[in-house]
Amino acid sequence: MMSKLRVLLIICLLLFPLTAVPLDGDQPADRPAERTQDDISSEHHPMFDAVRGCCPALACAMGCRPCCG
């Protein structure tokens, strides 16, 4: 009986290897370095002045670039 269970366990492990299971580290939320690269660019910043092509001083304080003179 025990040998049958061992054979069944080995077959299951061969058919469904643990490497096929996605790990938590593969989730985008767990990779902050890549997530920060996807931040809003200045052109899409809500305070970006498209006519002047720059951000007002208040928006520059919040990280919008380039700043208007």
UniProtKB/Swiss-Prot annotation:
Entry comment describing in which tissues the protein is expressed: Expressed by the venom duct.
Example GO molecular function term? ion channel inhibitor activity
Please state where this protein is localized: Secreted
Which residues of the precursor form the propeptide? 21-52
Where is region (Disordered) located? 22-43
**Organism superkingdom:** Eukaryota
> Which modifications occur after translation, per UniProt?
Mostly non-hydroxylated. Contains 3 disulfide bonds.
Q: Where is the signal peptide?
A: 1-20
* A Pfam family matched in the record: Conotoxin
Sorted alphabetically, the Gene Ontology cellular component annotations on this record are: extracellular region
* Compositionally biased tracts (Basic and acidic residues): 28-43
* Modification 4-hydroxyproline, positions: P66
Modified residue annotations for Cysteine amide: C68
Keywords from UniProt, A to Z, are:
Amidation, Disulfide bond, Hydroxylation, Ion channel impairing toxin, Neurotoxin, Secreted, Signal, Toxin, Voltage-gated sodium channel impairing toxin
Family statement drawn from the similarity comment of this UniProt entry: Belongs to the conotoxin M family.
Biological function: Mu-conotoxins block voltage-gated sodium channels (Nav).
Q: What is known of its domains?
A: The cysteine framework is III (CC-C-C-CC). Classified in the M-2 branch, since 2 residues stand between the fourth and the fifth cysteine residues.
Q: What is this protein called?
A: Mu-conotoxin-like Am3.1
Q: Which organism is it from?
A: Conus amadis (Amadis cone)
